[in-house]
From Swiss-Prot:
Keywords: Cytoplasm, Protein biosynthesis. PANTHER family: PEPTIDE CHAIN RELEASE FACTOR SUBUNIT 1 (PTHR10113). It comes from the Archaea. Pfam families: eRF1_1 (PF03463), eRF1_2 (PF03464), eRF1_3 (PF03465). It comes from Aeropyrum pernix (strain ATCC 700893 / DSM 11879 / JCM 9820 / NBRC 100138 / K1). GO terms for molecular function: translation release factor activity, codon specific. This is Peptide chain release factor subunit 1. Heterodimer of two subunits, one of which binds GTP. GO terms for cellular component: cytoplasm. Directs the termination of nascent peptide synthesis (translation) in response to the termination codons UAA, UAG and UGA. Belongs to the eukaryotic release factor 1 family. NCBIfam families: aRF1_eRF1.
Length: 373
């Protein structure tokens, strides 16, 4: 096989990389037998082979026979695969090789990532070192969400179709009492000072969690939400970092809850800010699918053969596909070819497990009824 053809086969997409990282993170070993190798573009493979041969030659110093054999096997597999190439691909090369010592299962993953590798790195460890790949699968359309009350706050993030709680905070602010006169005013000042301190704490946590994303260009906006006037006090006060203020949504959002439930409510209500976000699209598409299913309208299709036939006819308006499906990329391409919108159903969606078990994680909403349905 030619170098160009092999490079094409080795190159993986961001979705494929995200799926692979999820698998790699499951691997662990009782000893340092899992090999991780990062080769940046332009690095001569001959240099890498020399390093691996040197590492192989010193494995005899490993005292435990099982560990020694596992490391040798990983190094041999890496060298065998590198010999298939004459040069490093344009985005570099990554190898993860190792044995699951509890089952004896051995795997060696070699691929060229969707973005260039920046470092040359080799290590055998108790886990695969995936740190240098994490940024490549980070969604570039993130929205920060801050739900704030005078004594509670939640900081969350919407990344693509994933909604997650980053931090939950609690403060202590006493309630009202029946004092009068100066005592009342002094008590109120103390309460306001406590609220001020809590807001400062929320602002600091928001800076720690969200500013790095804003500086990388990942964070596209910040929503401030809450049940009362506290959110307005928080925004009007000098509590938010200027880098977050620049991308602050102009409208505050009323929500009744904290935590993940509050974040979901904020996302659904802040339509103008997150209308392009996949999470809201996934929620709406799933609701439409369930409505057609309940009413028996004949405007949905499921089952791989029927979905494929409907796509070929151009009858699918929206293709819903669960993010865990191994053939996700293939269906995305088929949908694009037929002009269908693709909704990737995230595992965080309430109906995700039901959708996967009942429909195999694949279904379509139709533009018009077809006879195969």
């Amino acid at each position: 096989m030619s170098q160009g053809r092999l490079e094409e086969r080795l190159t993986i997409s961001k979705r494929e990389l995200a799926r692979l990282l999820k698998e790699l993170k499951k691997w662990s070993a009782p000893a340092t037998v899992l090999l991780s190798l990062y080769i940046p573009p332009g690095r001569p493979l001959s240099d890498v082979m020399t390093l691996l041969r040197q590492e192989y030659s010193i494995t005899d110093n490993i005292k435990l026979k099982r560990t020694r054999q596992a490391v040798k096997r990983a190094l041999s597999a890496a060298m065998d695969r590198l010999q298939m190439l004459t040069s490093t691909p344009p985005n570099g090369l990554v190898l993860f090789c190792g044995e699951d010592m509890s089952t004896g299962k051995f795997e060696c993953f070699m691929f060229s990532p969707p973005e260039p590798i920046r470092v040359f790195y080799y290590r055998t460890d108790k886990r695969f070192i995936t740190d240098f790949l994490e940024d490549m699968v980070e969604d570039n359309n993130a929205i920060g969400i801050i739900i704030v009350e005078r004594d509670q706050a939640t900081i969350g993030l919407l990344k693509g179709a994933r909604l997650e709680v980053l931090k939950e905070l609690e403060g202590f602010v006493p309630g009202k009492h029946k004092m009068g006169g100066q005592s009342q005013r002094r008590y109120e000042r103390i309460i306001e000072q406590m609220v001020d301190e809590f807001f400062k704490k929320v602002g600091e946590e928001a800076s720690n969690l969200l500013v790095p994303l804003a500086e990388k260009g990942v964070l596209k906006g910040v929503i401030v939400a809450g049940p009362g006037l506290a959110k307005q006090e928080f925004v009007e006060g000098n509590y938010l970092d200027y880098r977050l203020k620049k991308i602050l949504a102009p409208e505050l959002v009323d929500v009744a809850y904290q935590g993940l439930q509050g974040l979901k409510e904020a996302v659904m209500k802040a339509e103008k800010v997150v209308e392009a976000q996949m999470y809201r699209d996934a929620v709406n598409a799933m609701e439409e699918f369930k409505l057609h299913l309940a009413k028996g309208t004949g405007m949905i299709v499921y089952g791989e053969k029927d979905v494929e036939a409907a796509l070929e006819m151009g009858a699918v308006k929206t293709l819903l596909i669960h993010e865990s499906r191994e053939d996700l990329e293939e269906w995305v391409e088929k949908a694009k070819s037929s002009g269908a919108q693709v909704i990737v159903v995230p595992e965080s969606l309430a109906e995700a497990e039901w959708f996967l078990k009942t429909f195999g994680g694949l279904a379509g909403i139709l533009r018009f009824r077809i006879s195969t349905v």
